[in-house]
Regions:
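Recognition helix of helix-turn-helix/homeodomain-like DNA-binding domains
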Residues: 28-43
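Helix-turn-helix DNA-binding elements, focusing on the entry/boundary residues of the two helices
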Residues: 20, 31, 45-48
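A short, Lys/Arg-rich alpha-helix, primarily the initiator
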Residues: 1-22
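Short, basic-rich loop-to-helix N-cap that marks the start of a DNA-contacting helix
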Residues: 40-53
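Short C-terminal boundary/hinge segments that cap the last helix of small helical domains
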Residues: 56-72
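Alpha-helical residues within the helix-turn-helix
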Residues: 14, 25, 53
């Protein structure tokens, strides 16, 4: 079973030592709003690209960690 975009974001946040609040601040949105988007897996492609940039990942249709090359 593959992970949702929201689940992938949570995995990468953990590996980056970041919190949801950190990501919300860096993407200029409230933590509750971002939390809702993650739980509902409701993102636009533009939002996913911005999140990937903040997390130092490449966004294709998957997340790929730039430093390890691991696809999540």
């Amino acid at each position: 079973m593959s992970l949702t975009a929201g689940e992938k974001i949570k995995v990468i946040l953990g590996r980056r030592g970041m919190t949801l609040a950190d990501l919300a601040e860096k993407t200029e949105q409230s933590r509750p709003n971002l939390s809702n988007k993650i739980s509902r897996d409701n993102f636009s492609e533009k939002e996913l690209k911005e999140i990937a940039t903040v997390l130092d990942c490449t966004f294709e249709t998957i997340f790929k960690m730039n430093d390890t090359g691991e696809e999540i």
